[in-house]
A protein has these predicted regions:
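Distinct, well-ordered alpha-helical segments
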Residues: 34, 69-70
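Hydrophobic "anchor" residues
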Residues: 11-14
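C-terminal domain-tail junction helix/linker
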Residues: 74-78, 100-160
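RNase H-like polynucleotidyl transferase catalytic core
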Residues: 19, 55-60, 75-93, 109-114
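Active-site beta-loop-alpha junctions of metal-dependent nucleic acid enzymes
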Residues: 7, 18-48
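Acidic/histidine-rich, metal-coordinating catalytic segments
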Residues: 46-65, 84-86, 91, 139-143
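Short loop/turn microsegments at loop-to-beta-strand junctions
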Residues: 1-4
Length: 160
């Protein structure tokens, strides 16, 4: 199973993800995921609202650096940025998420075949967003943090 995700670096929410049986990372799932992430965060809009500069940080995989992907990111109001070559530590939040997801979710899944894994992923991502605590969010889940931010309850962790 191959997977990719779009994660907010402020509130740690996985806004969109794609997974499929097999290896390789085609560009189309990445582009679909970008559109979904923007729509989930900002509603049915054509792009990120004016006045907000958001970066799309990715590694240097072909699907992410493809002309079509970078053009779509810009059209959505995102600024495409790639990590330095041979420097996975510069994408530390993504690397940390992958390790956490493997440890806390994949290790507890039935792994008998790809379809079994794929069937379990929606619940795992939902649990990560709704329940999984983050030390950087004062041990709140991503969505709990967002709800409290929306209510104005904790401006101490406001992300710009």
């Amino acid at each position: 199973v191959t997977a990719t995700f779009a994660k907010d670096c402020c509130d740690r929410e996985v806004m969109a993800w794609r997974a499929w049986e097999g290896k390789g990372l085609p560009g189309e799932p990445v582009r679909e995921m970008l559109i979904e992430a923007v729509e989930r965060r900002f509603g049915s809009v054509e792009a990120v609202p004016q006045g907000q500069e958001l970066e799309f940080l990715s590694d240097n995989g072909g699907a992410y650096i493809a002309t079509e992907t970078r053009a779509l990111a810009r059209a959505l109001g995102l600024k495409p940025i790639n990590t330095p070559v041979c420097s996975p530590q510069s994408n530390g939040m993504a690397e940390s998420f992958v390790n956490t997801f493997k440890r806390d979710y994949v290790a507890r899944m039935g792994l008998s075949d790809a379809q079994t894994v794929l069937a379990q992923l929606p619940a795992a991502f939902e649990h990560f967003n709704e329940v999984h605590p983050h030390s950087s969010l004062k041990m709140r889940s991503s969505r709990e943090f967002r709800r409290q931010q929306a209510a104005g309850a904790d401006q101490a962790l406001y992300c710009e």
